Amino acid sequence: MGALDSLSEYISDYFRVTRKRRKRKVMQTVNIKVKMDCDGCERRVKNAVSSMKGVKSVEVNRKIHKVTVSGYVEPKKVLKRIERTGKKAEIWPYVPYNMVAYPYAVGTYDKKAPAGYVRKSEQSQLQLLPGAPENHYISLFSDENPNACTVM
């Protein structure tokens, strides 16, 4: 009986360790941009996403081409599921205008962006960092600089 007891303890310990290693999914909200033209497109996308395991709520805004999914899901899996419907999809590339400290960076304004949104840009986020290098182009054309370009 001693061998069976030790074997059963070994097996139970093995399964206990594998249970602890399982990655728990976290509750998150995934925003995806999907081109939708009609009620059928909207219904098809909503049904495809709502049938996924772990989805708590699905909101579709056809006016700004946005699908918001809340639940215990991974963004890549939601994106793949929407692409299976035949629609082109991408992670929501915009942020609200008032959330960006300096939205005047190159590439942030997009004609296709919904009203009140600007495109996410890495350049505008880099300017917010305290140790970010600054460009001193203005000092090149000052009167105190003897090497500055002058037109007489």
Swiss-Prot record:
Keywords: Cadmium, Lipoprotein, Membrane, Metal-binding, Methylation, Prenylation
Family matches, as CDD domains: HMA
A GO term, aspect molecular function: metal ion binding
UniProt-listed GO biological process terms: detoxification of cadmium ion
Consequence of gene disruption: No visible phenotype. Hipp20, hipp21 and hipp22 triple mutants are cadmium sensitive.
Subcellular location as annotated: Membrane
Lineage top rank: taxon: Eukaryota
Modified residue annotations for Cysteine methyl ester: C149
Propeptide part(s) removed at maturation, as residue ranges: 150-152
Record InterPro entries: HMA_dom, HMA_dom_sf
Binding site for Cd(2+): C38, C41
Tissue: Expressed in roots, shoot apical meristem, leaves and flowers.
Similarity field: Belongs to the HIPP family.
Biological function: Heavy-metal-binding protein. Binds cadmium. May be involved in cadmium transport and play a role in cadmium detoxification.
Entry protein name: Heavy metal-associated isoprenylated plant protein 20
Lineage: Eukaryota, Viridiplantae, Streptophyta, Embryophyta, Tracheophyta
